[in-house]
Amino acid sequence: MGDVMIQSVKTESGLVDGHHGSCDSLGCVVGALAKVAKLVVALAALVLNGALCVLSLVALCVGATPVGPLAVLVATTLASFLCVAYVLFIAAKDRGWIASTNKC
C-alpha cells in the first residue's frame, strides 16, 4: 500500500474531521519526489554560492588574483544566487515546500 497521510473531511455539522487515509496515487509520489529534488538542487546551489563568495573575498583580500578571475567568481556567485531564487520562489507554484501536500 501507499503512505498513510491525514486527510481532512468536512462533516455535516460544519466541523472538520481528520482521519487517516492511504495515498496510492502515483502523482503524489512523483510530486513529493519533485519537491525533494528541487530542495536538494537549491541547497546545493546555496552551498556553491557560499563557497564562491568566500573564495572571491579571499582572493580580493590577498590580492593574488587578477580582476578578471575575480569578476568570473562574482558573476558565478550571482548566477548561483539567481538559480536558488528561481528554484525556491519563482518555479514553486505553492511558494513553499510544505504547502498543501495532501492533493491525492
Swiss-Prot record:
Primary location class: secreted
Compartment(s): Secreted; Host vacuole, Host pathogen-containing vacuole, Host pathogen-containing vacuole membrane
Highest rank taxon of the organism: Bacteria
InterPro entries attached to this UniProt entry: IncF (IPR035119)
UniProtKB keywords: Host membrane, Membrane, Secreted, Transmembrane, Transmembrane helix, Virulence
Membrane topology: Multi-pass membrane protein
Transmembrane segments: 39-59, 70-90
Pfam families: IncF
Record's keyword annotation contains Transmembrane helix: yes
Recorded GO CC terms: extracellular region; host cell membrane; pathogen-containing vacuole membrane
Induction / repression: Cotranscribed with incD, incE and incG within 2 hours after internalization.
Role: Inclusion membrane protein probably involved in early modification events of the chlamydial inclusion.
Protein name as it appears in the record: Inclusion membrane protein F
